Amino acid sequence: MAPSVMEPVAAFDVPTKAAPNLVAPEPEHCPGPESEQAGKGDACAGCPNQAICASAPKGPDPDIPIITERLSQIRHKILVLSGKGGVGKSTFSSLLAHAFASNPESTVGLCDTDICGPSIPKMMGVESETIHVSNAGWSPVWVTDNLSVMSIQFMLPNRDDAIIWRGPKKNGMIKQFLKDVDWGDLDYLIVDTPPGTSDEHLSVNSLLKESGVDGAVIVTTPQEVSLLDVRKEIDFCRKAGIRILGLVENMRGFVCPGCSNTSEIFRATTGGGKRLAKKMGIPFLGSVPLDPRVGMACDYGESFVDNFPDSPASKAIKQVVRSVGEMLGEDPNTVLPPDENDMVE
């Protein structure tokens, strides 16, 4: 029987540490209510929560060793982040997964941790699938022979059902994706996250840190309103100890489906992603133009990279994949062998 969010099986009884019930918001320099210094540090002096934090349970999550063992067969773990919704982060995650998997020598997993807005199954063409449970754990849904997906969407009795959960329950679900899913031997695990810096990001980072998360790819668009939030995302990564693999500028230019020429729609009013990456001291992985056929491919659950290899967007995505591979210490041309379509015009 497949697990369901409406009729949870035993696997949903996720053991989580009880968070302290704070009487006031955490101050700016708070070490964290679950940290070893909670209630003891200099920043705690005078805080209304000091006594509560000092008496709260401390120590590492007991499930982290289990997660580390489960993910030990995965060579590279990549987070995909964005500061703002609507920049194409989930679309980019699906394109990244398809591009990595276009190399038949690579095995790729895509984990959808956007609990309240799971769109990955639709984009990958497996929306109607369900999860199977065996002695080895939950089996991810296989899109192709070398590309698998896990999402809460597979557990919904009806695809339009809303997920209305508070932070601890969402964190418990993410923990199950990492602890109970039988990913097997993977070359790459791509973790698509919700926008912003929320509970899900903290949960994924804390659970993956011991198992060696390689880093994060941050997605933005050229406009300053997106870059404003990306600066916060970069600051979050640095404070959380997440290595930034690089910044990707999405929707930079529009590809005409008739003539394949590229024109600017969302102009970079303050220099765009490339200038921001240079200013913030992080790698710039490349710009991906907006091609209407990307949306069409996602709606039909097909691989845009495979269906439209001559599109400037496909060529740009492949270059980003090679850049990510290089940041991971791999040979870019081994990660994705070049072909005659890959020269970006």
Swiss-Prot record:
InterPro entries: Mrp-like_CS (IPR000808), Mrp/NBP35_ATP-bd (IPR019591), NUBP1/Nbp35 (IPR028601), P-loop_NTPase (IPR027417), YlxH/NBP35 (IPR033756). One of its GO terms (molecular function) is ATP binding. ATP binds at G83, K84, G85, G86, V87, G88, K89, S90. GO terms for cellular component: cytosol. It is found in: Cytoplasm. SUPFAM superfamilies: P-loop containing nucleoside triphosphate hydrolases. [4Fe-4S] cluster 2 binds at C256, C259. It comes from the Eukaryota. Its cofactor is [4Fe-4S] cluster. Transmembrane segments: none annotated. [4Fe-4S] cluster 1 binds at C30, C44, C47, C53. Keywords: 4Fe-4S, ATP-binding, Cytoplasm, Iron, Iron-sulfur, Metal-binding, Nucleotide-binding. Its main location: cytoplasm. Binds 4 [4Fe-4S] clusters per heterotetramer. Contains two stable clusters in the N-termini of nbp35 and two labile, bridging clusters between subunits of the nbp35-cfd1 heterotetramer. GO terms for biological process: iron-sulfur cluster assembly. PANTHER family: CYTOSOLIC FE-S CLUSTER ASSEMBLY FACTOR NUBP1, NUCLEOTIDE-BINDING PROTEIN NBP35 YEAST -RELATED. Heterotetramer of 2 nbp35 and 2 cfd1 chains. Belongs to the Mrp/NBP35 ATP-binding proteins family. NUBP1/NBP35 subfamily. Component of the cytosolic iron-sulfur (Fe/S) protein assembly (CIA) machinery. Required for maturation of extramitochondrial Fe-S proteins. The nbp35-cfd1 heterotetramer forms a Fe-S scaffold complex, mediating the de novo assembly of an Fe-S cluster and its transfer to target apoproteins. This is Cytosolic Fe-S cluster assembly factor nbp35. It comes from Aspergillus fumigatus (strain ATCC MYA-4609 / CBS 101355 / FGSC A1100 / Af293).
